[in-house]
Amino acid sequence: MTNERAAPASRPAVTDVDLFSAQLGRLRFVHLRRRDVVAQAVSWAKSLQTHFWHPGEAVAPGGEDPHYDEELIGRLVATIERSEADWTVWFAAHSIVPCEVTYEELAADPPRTAQEVLDYLGLDVPPDRQLVVRHRRQADQLNADWITRFKSH
């Protein structure tokens, strides 16, 4: 006598997109990424070291003065690249074509980029409102130096 059981009846897989759609209705996806992953990794490394995440802040409690750490930057580049690859696979697996926005486009022309995203989402800014840009770049000469140094290896 064997100890076999009948396999459970297969049910259609419920995806995370299905779950989100059930709760939120029609979904539209905006994929924000940075073309220059080394610059992104450098900014991330500095923030990890200083605990400074927003313009106008100083080194936060527990933070330290930034110092070049090639190993950390390399690990962060790899993390960013894996994450971007994972998003590419996830979007493709769900037949999703997101609105692609790069940090570089957003930083160069925030109002235009925001309007493109709103258009993609089918949203209008109410007539009595306007888009206000509050973004300030945190990158400085130290970022530029670290980027150059990392890319030269």
Language model features with spans:
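PAPS-dependent sulfotransferase catalytic domain
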Residues: 1-98, 111-126
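PAPS-dependent sulfotransferase catalytic core
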Residues: 59-74, 105, 125-153
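An alpha-helix initiation/capping motif
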Residues: 104-111
